[in-house]
Amino acid sequence: MEEERILCEAIHYNDGNIHRNQPKEIESGFIIAGYRHDTCVYIKSLINSNLREVKQGFLTNKKRFVDGYEAFEIAQKAGQILDPELAKEKGKRLLSEDLW
């Protein structure tokens, strides 16, 4: 079985509606994915929508949306973190600059 890896940054925008083709754990709202979180924010600025909640996180190759803490564990296990010692000093929360 393939090891789970981080694919890209993502933000969960919860507008209270159910949308098709979202990651497994997203019950309502939608995901915008991008190379960096600010790319996701910019794309969202082009869309008009009422939001209840906004969460930054990451998408994995297993079609899951995970927060920065779970992403840190996944990326660490997969050897994706550029500077593991620096990442540990900042805390066990993955940031986009830890990957790219």
Predicted regions and their residues:
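Linear-motif-rich, low-complexity cytosolic tails and juxtamembrane regions
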Residues: 1-56, 60-100
